[in-house]
């Protein structure tokens, strides 16, 4: 359906080119339909239609650009030659993914997410994001997740879509979005794919956005700037125990997935009087503590055990942004003071989360980061000097302050029409620049998937983590891509 004058011109051109065409004019309307049949080898037909669609219906528009949000500014500066901060979300479907259908679904979806369908651009004073003009090519998934993405590729597109059999995966550069925003993108892409593939109607609910709607301006905002408080928080923290091992020489990432019944984990967490996230964090801290005890027999040489727990700030503030909007809490124990039981660690994690996972505390943390961004000295620095300064800050107060990051996206909810087509969900966060482990958690359809990734050969932490869960009587299934030599 197009404007009448345009329809008439297209109709006449199609007839002149030898096509069969009929013009249907809507009564008392300025619109019409053009029905046409193309003959074989009618290249001129296609060129005329393509010209009409691209030049008249979809004229070229200037590409949108956005400043990096407050949390994102550190990621381009912190990059290494063989490391960029990516994370992965994937949906395993009940049938093999049709890449042709997925390609058209991706074309629709990227237009709905102008803050994610972007590339990283370099300015004089800051990096910034620029909307991409078309969707990236769909790639075949590799033998392991989160294969290193060269920084030049991020400058072309800051996310990638990968397919392997039934699995549809999206990997995001962390400067673009966080786990919550990435999950909304994956849900919406999967919904559009299923709609096109099976002709089902999937409503815009439970994290699926309306694919043909215009983006809401609130989805594009930097919510850190909006909710920064007046009082700043201290960044002073002790350096944590550093996990180590034999690096994989070719950059291979070993992935171990532990699968547990959600109900069993909830029941066990309730026994300890903590939430599911607090329970999993306590188990991880217990595993790290046990591993350090083995490796460092002398108690006074041990370092604090700390796990960084991301907090989705959308739960504390009324934000709808699809960009980064998360902070963190870092519970810790100090093994030099003595041994800790799992119950004691659960109590420490619970009270630390209760103290810091609070809107007032978080506004102070946000204010600390925003104050740095607003510094007149930093703003005046050329980008190449900023990169040096920000990388030094990242090394000083970033990853060395925790053993690893444990991020739990919680229980995934999907529209009822969509759920029967999804067999599994996974969330994997890349290893840190200077630490060999990280852990992503997500639950779907009664199963919790704990994805532990590492860039060293020894699966020592995974073994200790499994041992703690097994000792508690929890049924655990394990799968791994580890190479046996």
Q: What label would you give each PLM region?
A:
Residues 2-9:
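Conserved alpha/beta-hydrolase "acid-adjacent" motif
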Residues 59-218, 265-270, 275-297, 400, ...:
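Non-catalytic N-terminal regions of enzymes
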């Amino acid at each position: 359906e197009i404007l009448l004058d345009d329809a008439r011109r297209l109709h006449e051109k199609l007839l002149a080119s030898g096509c069969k065409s009929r013009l249907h004019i809507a009564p008392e309307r300025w619109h019409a339909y053009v029905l046409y049949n193309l003959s074989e080898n009618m290249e001129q037909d296609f060129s005329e239609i393509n010209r009409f669609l691209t030049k008249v219906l979809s004229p070229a528009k200037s590409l949108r650009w956005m400043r990096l949000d407050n949390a994102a500014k550190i990621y381009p500066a912190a990059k290494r030659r063989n490391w960029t901060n990516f994370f992965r979300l994937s949906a395993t479907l009940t049938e093999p993914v049709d890449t042709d259908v997925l390609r058209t679904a991706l074309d629709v979806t990227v237009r709905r997410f102008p803050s994610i369908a972007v590339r990283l651009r370099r300015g004089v004073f800051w990096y910034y994001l620029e909307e991409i003009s078309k969707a990236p090519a769909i790639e075949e998934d590799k033998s392991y997740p989160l294969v290193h993405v060269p920084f030049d590729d991020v400058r072309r597109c800051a996310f990638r879509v990968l397919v392997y059999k039934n699995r549809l995966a999206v990997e995001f550069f962390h400067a673009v979005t966080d786990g919550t925003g990435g999950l909304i993108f994956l849900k919406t892409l999967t919904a559009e794919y299923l709609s096109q593939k099976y002709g089902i109607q999937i409503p815009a609910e439970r994290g699926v956005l309306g694919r043909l709607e215009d983006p809401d301006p609130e989805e594009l905002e930097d919510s850190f700037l909006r909710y920064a408080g007046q009082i700043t928080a201290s960044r002073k923290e002790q350096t944590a125990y550093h996990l180590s091992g034999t690096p994989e020489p070719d950059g291979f990432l070993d992935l171990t997935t532990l699968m547990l019944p959600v109900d069993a984990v909830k029941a066990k967490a309730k026994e300890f009087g903590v939430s599911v996230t607090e329970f999993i964090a306590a188990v991880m801290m217990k595993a790290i503590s046990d591993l350090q005890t083995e490796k460092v027999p002398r108690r006074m040489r041990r370092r604090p055990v700390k796990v960084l727990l991301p907090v989705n700030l959308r739960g504390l503030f009324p934000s709808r942004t699809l960009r980064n909007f998360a902070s963190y809490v870092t519970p810790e124990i100090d093994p030099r003071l003595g041994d800790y039981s799992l119950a004691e660690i659960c109590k420490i994690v619970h009270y630390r989360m209760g103290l810091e996972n609070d809107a007032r505390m978080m506004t102070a943390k946000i204010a600390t980061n925003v104050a740095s961004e607003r510094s007149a000295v930093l703003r005046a620095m050329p980008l190449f000097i900023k990169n040096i300064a920000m990388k030094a800050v990242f090394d000083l107060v970033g990853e060395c302050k925790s053993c690893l990051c444990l991020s739990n996206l919680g229980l995934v909810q999907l529209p009822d029409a969509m759920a029967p087509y999804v067999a599994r969900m996974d969330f994997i966060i890349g290893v840190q620049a200077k630490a060999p482990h990280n852990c992503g958690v997500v639950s779907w359809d009664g199963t919790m998937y704990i994805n532990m990734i590492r860039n060293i050969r020894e699966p020592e932490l995974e073994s200790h983590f499994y041992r703690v869960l097994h000792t508690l009587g929890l049924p655990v299934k394990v799968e791994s891509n580890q190479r046996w030599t």
